Amino acid sequence: MQPIPDVNQRIARISAHLHPPKSQMEESSALRRANCRAKGGAPGFKVAILGAAGGIGQPLAMLMKMNPLVSVLHLYDVVNAPGVTADISHMDTGAVVRGFLGQQQLEAALTGMDLIIVPAGVPRKPGMTRDDLFKINAGIVKTLCEGIAKCCPRAIVNLISNPVNSTVPIAAEVFKKAGTYDPKRLLGVTMLDVVRANTFVAEVLGLDPRDVDVPVVGGHAGVTILPLLSQVKPPSSFTQEEISYLTDRIQNGGTEVVEAKAGAGSATLSMAYAAVKFADACLRGLRGDAGVIECAFVSSQVTELPFFASKVRLGRNGIEEVYSLGPLNEYERIGLEKAKKELAGSIEKGVSFIRS
């Protein structure tokens, strides 16, 4: 027979779910008392998703709930967080899920987290470039990063909010102002460019995409996305026509999805998949796994620009090493110059947003 305290806890837990006060959110003292699983959750890392109710955030939350490295999953948004939290929390995996609604709960969502994933912001619409998103998303990223600087300055930050070429510099400037900036812990997520490159190259070569690795460097918009097809693994040769086709399709993959959805959304599902793939790499790095290498938009000395996307090795402190570009062919060298010219303006735009 179960001891009486256990029975009471179980009854309280059921009652909290059947009769939630307003919403099943972290602010509820009844739910906090009932959520005894959280005290002894599965070993792992604490992860927060900021923008968890959005088009990327929802599938991202679902996939992170499935990750065995996650012990606690915090879902934050300014709208609809209670519903997403309730839905995701029913999945029979180890991570304990907690929801947080609105600016007043941002600090609670962030406190004690190991990894912060930020897909918050408005999505792309037909005819809209990533730079068109700047005016709205820049302010959102600024506010969220101010919270991160205050509540979990040692967390690894995976920034998805577009335009990444500008929002990463914004985040860096916010952290600098707060005195918490660690360039090893701020990473712009460009994994979707790599995922697309692997997929499209595999189609041309007739291979399984899981067996293909294409380094994608530069940035995360248009011509700043530079796939290094000369460094594809397994080693492969391409005709000039194939190189032009692949480069163009990789650079414009986001537009391809926006147009195909005809106003109904952007690349939310593939982005969520790519974000989870990158987050998993960060968590494996935090765990101490060796040889965790992915591409990301980070503080860099690879070029004369202060930020650049290239391969990085991930570890317990975030970025352990930033790799050089390696040998480039003539087509890639020309593409690199175009990418740097475009990137310089985007980076300055982000820096100026905070400094001005």
From Swiss-Prot:
Q: Where is the transit peptide?
A: 1-36
Q: From which domain of life does this come?
A: Eukaryota
- Active site residues of this protein: 220 (proton acceptor)
* Record key words, sorted: Glyoxylate bypass, Glyoxysome, NAD, Oxidoreductase, Peroxisome, Transit peptide, Tricarboxylic acid cycle
Family that this chain belongs to = Belongs to the LDH/MDH superfamily. MDH type 1 family.
- Catalyses which reaction(s): (S)-malate + NAD(+) = oxaloacetate + NADH + H(+)
Localization recorded for this chain is: Glyoxysome
Keyword Oxidoreductase appears in the UniProt entry: yes
Does the record bear NAD in its keywords?
A: yes
One Pfam match: Ldh_1_N
EC numbers on record: 1.1.1.37
The biological processes this protein is annotated with in GO are:
glyoxylate cycle; malate metabolic process; tricarboxylic acid cycle
This protein's name: Malate dehydrogenase, glyoxysomal
The residues the record assigns to binding NAD(+) are: 51-57, 77, 137, 160-162, 271
**Top class in the EC scheme:** oxidoreductase
Q: Which GO terms describe its cellular component?
A: chloroplast; glyoxysome
Per its record, what are the GO molecular function terms?
L-malate dehydrogenase (NAD+) activity
What does the annotation say about its assembly with partners? Answer: Homodimer.
Any idea which positions bind substrate?
A: 124, 130, 162, 196
